[in-house]
Amino acid sequence: LVLVGFACEQKVQVEPVAEKVTSPDISNKQQPEITINPFSPVDVSPMDMSYFPVDYPKIKMANANIPPPVARLIYSRPHLQRRALFNGVLKYEEPWRLGANEASEINFYKTVTIQGKKIPAGRYIIYGIPHPDKWTIILNSNIDSWGLKQDASKDAGRFEIPITNNDISLEYFTMVFEKTDTGAASFF
């Protein structure tokens, strides 16, 4: 790894320019539609994070001496853009990296138990395989791999999650944690 930096201490005199500055025309760019998302406010930036406990960064700012969070999800937020989710974006029985641009990552700051299986503290990519009646969610230790070719030999755990349907159509993919009586659940 080679890092190169340049600095200059010369003073440069800049003459003011009396030119009219106009904003670029963005009328031909896609503008986000107003959508309702009952799970989390939508940040239209391509990257998002979810913590457990929820709002951990705010809690830490109020008290710097608290322990690390239990988990953090980092993902790029894809959206449908009027496409059909299945047969348009995803296919049943094929892996999806649960996000756009990069492999989504989950970091556990301590050992957690998911469906009775202990997962050691660490950083994992998280991806899923959709089936008509359930999803297989996979935690994999092959980090920094962009998530396009999964190496099953590095799976830390596979979990079958039944599908729950609702009547809400969401434009933006969202992953959030929610506190439960037994710990936390993550919703996609």
Map each language-model feature to its residues:
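Sec-dependent bacterial lipoprotein signal peptides
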Residues: 1-6
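Bacterial signal peptide processing site
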Residues: 8-12
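Post-signal peptide N-terminal segment of mature Sec-exported envelope proteins
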Residues: 17-42
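Early exported N-terminus immediately downstream of N-terminal targeting peptides
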Residues: 53-88
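Extracytoplasmic
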Residues: 68-70, 101-103, 119-121, 132-134, ...
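Mid-length scaffold segments of soluble, non-membrane domains
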Residues: 91-149
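Surface-exposed, gly/pro-biased binding rims or lids
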Residues: 144-184
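Short, exposed beta-strand-loop hairpins at the edges of beta-sheets
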Residues: 186-188
